[in-house]
Amino acid sequence: MKVKSFAKIDLGYSVYKKRKNITKHDFESIFILVESVYDDIEIIKIDKNVDDVHYYNETNEIYVYSRLVYKTLEWIRQTYRIKNHYRINIKKRIPIGAGLGGGSSNAAVIMKSILELEGIKEINYKDVVNKLGADIPFFLSGYKTAYVSDCGSTLEDLSGQFKLSYEVHLMNVNVNTKLVFEKFDDNQWHVIKNNFKTIIKNLKENIVTNIYNDLQEHCFELYPNIRYKYNELLREGFYTILSGAGSSFICIKLKDKENQVIHEN
């Protein structure tokens, strides 16, 4: 089975402080699938007692260790009592550490494909979030745009409800998401600025304003070169927001231009 594993961008990102005995941050965001940026994944049933995962660029095999992919394979096997094993070939195009959900997309596509091959249709999103990750349910959902909350397990389909013209600006920086969240946690004072009900209403009326990413300033503190690029994009006239923990930007522009992806060398 051959499948595409698409990237996503986060339009606005509100992060809530962790509550006692809760290991994950609750958040709100609008996730948008980016179908022009994707990894190619091939899934082959093999006659072995272990799974075999390989990563490639356009020409060669490369070393990438994704704990999430192996964790997903283990979760599938334990949850659904699957006995078959698989070789997974992943041709990487989604940049690593770019805030585009590449690892989660890979995990979701692998999960969905293997369950399809095994004839299994039911997936518990809350269990996926608790055991694997908050971005995975979006990639499982089939939605092109969604309002996401409840640690990623609750999704409201917004596909086709507004038209947004944007560029995705990819920087050649691998951001450490864990460090960005640690910076966020160290900050004692935090005010939620986004009102997603208003943001969604405005987007449907072609109004883009008052959209914030709570991780943006913490990313900039750790990576000053990303802040520099942000200021440069602002000077070019874009409404610019960091995607996730970084390093990619969503640059919103005039709606009569085509969406595109720009790579920073």
From Swiss-Prot:
UniProt-listed GO biological process terms: isopentenyl diphosphate biosynthetic process, methylerythritol 4-phosphate pathway; terpenoid biosynthetic process
Enzyme's top EC category: transferase
InterPro entries (UniProt xref): GHMP_kinase_C_sf (IPR036554), GHMP_kinase_N_dom (IPR006204), IspE (IPR004424), Ribosomal_Su5_D2-typ_SF (IPR020568), Ribsml_uS5_D2-typ_fold_subgr (IPR014721)
Enzyme Commission no: 2.7.1.148
UniProt feature coiled coil, ranges: none
Active site per database record: K8, D135
Keywords for the protein's UniProt record, in alphabetical order: ATP-binding, Isoprene biosynthesis, Kinase, Nucleotide-binding, Transferase
Family matches, as HAMAP family: IspE (MF_00061)
Matches recorded under PANTHER family: 4-DIPHOSPHOCYTIDYL-2-C-METHYL-D-ERYTHRITOL KINASE, CHLOROPLASTIC
Matches recorded under NCBIfam families: PRK05905.1
Function, in words: Catalyzes the phosphorylation of the position 2 hydroxy group of 4-diphosphocytidyl-2C-methyl-D-erythritol.
Protein name: 4-diphosphocytidyl-2-C-methyl-D-erythritol kinase
Species this chain originates from: Ureaplasma urealyticum serovar 10 (strain ATCC 33699 / Western)
